[in-house]
Amino acid sequence: NITVSCNDVELVKNTDYTVSYSNNKNVGTATISITGIGDYTGTITKNFNIVARDISDTTIGSIPNQTYTGNSISALPVITYNGATLTKGTDYTLTYSNNVNVGTGTVTITGKGNFKGTTSKTFSISARAMSDTSVANISSQTYTGNVISPLPTITYNNKTLKKDTDYTLSYSDNINAGTATITITGKGNFTGMTSMTFIITQKSAEKLNISEIANQIYTGKKIKPNVVITDTER
C-alpha cells in the first residue's frame, strides 16, 4: 500500500494517479511506477526490497514410511507455500542423515531463492521382510553322526547379509540321513522368517573301519566271529 500526497493533501488513486508494478514477485528489488492523471501528469518511481521468506513458514507434507533397501533412502517431501508447490533445487535443497538403516531418518530442508533458513522432517525406515532375500542352495552333506550345520549364503540387493547381525539360524533334523531344515530369522534391518532345506546323504560303508578277524578253530558248525566296525570320522 502506498500513500501519495501533494501539499499535505492525500491524492486519490485512479482519480489523481495510477500505480503499476514491476519485478514485484521474487526476492530482489521491485519498482512502483506512479503516473499522474486528471490534474496531474508525469511518472515517478519508487523501489522496495522483497526479502526471502523463512522456509519454516512452509507446509511440509508427511513422508510415507520407507522400507530398508541397503542403500541411502532419499524420500522426497512435498513442500507447499500459499497453495503452491515448491520446486527442489529452485526453492530449497535437501540433505539426509540416518537414512540407511532401520530407525528414524531425517531430511534437512534449506531455503533457496525466495526462501531462507532451514527446517527438517523425519521419516521412518522399517525392516525388510526376510522373505525378500535370496538364499543360495546348500549342497548335499554326508552323514557324520554329529550335528551338521552348514551356513547358507543370504543376499539382498546384491549385498551379502551377516549372520547374527542381519539374521540368526536354527536347525532341525540335521543329524541323520534325510532332509534337514534351516530356519532363518531376520534381525536388525530384516524381519520375519524364511526357511530352506538341505539333504544329508548316507555315509558309504567303504569309509568304515572293520577290525581284523582272528583265526577261528574248527567247530563243525558255522562260525560267526564278532566283528568290530568303527567310524573313525565321528
Which ranges hold each PLM region?
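Serine/threonine-rich, repeat-prone extracellular segments and beta-strand-based repeat modules
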Residues: 10-41, 46, 85-121, 160-193, ...
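Solvent-exposed, low-complexity, repeat-rich "mucin-like" stalks and linkers
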Residues: 1-9, 47, 51-84, 122, ...
